[in-house]
Amino acid sequence: MSWAGSGRRQELPEDWELNYRLPVLSAANWLCQINGPGCVRAATDVDHIKRGNDHSRSNLQAACHVCHGKKSAAEGVARRRELRARRKRPPERHPGRR
């Protein structure tokens, strides 16, 4: 997902670039830590390992744009599936069963 259609950037700390993004990329030697299929190895993005707003270093990893895009897309699909499942009515128990 591109930043253009996302409100996610507003949730990042004001000092994201200087105190989060650059140190994470530098610590990884600017190499993608996801290393998935199609990886271009040159890290340009910082990914939250677990979804949410935990910006601790242990929850951040360097990622190339290809791996980051694929991971974010997969997480989005999983989240939509989870929300859709919550809308479904749970199956009713048979009245004769205890």
From Swiss-Prot:
Q: Which Gene3D superfamilies match?
A: 1.10.30.50
Q: Which InterPro entries match?
A: HNH, HNH_nuc
**Region of interest (Disordered), ranges:** 75-98
Q: Which domain of life is it from?
A: Viruses
Where are the coiled-coil regions?
Answer: none
Q: Which SMART domains match?
A: HNHc
Task: Point to the regions of Basic residues compositional bias.
Answer: 81-98
GO molecular function terms noted in the UniProt entry: endonuclease activity; nucleic acid binding; zinc ion binding
Q: Locate the HNH domain: which residues?
A: 38-73
Q: What is this protein called?
A: Gene 4 protein
Organism expressing this protein natively = Mycobacterium phage L5 (Mycobacteriophage L5)
- Which gene name does the record give? 4
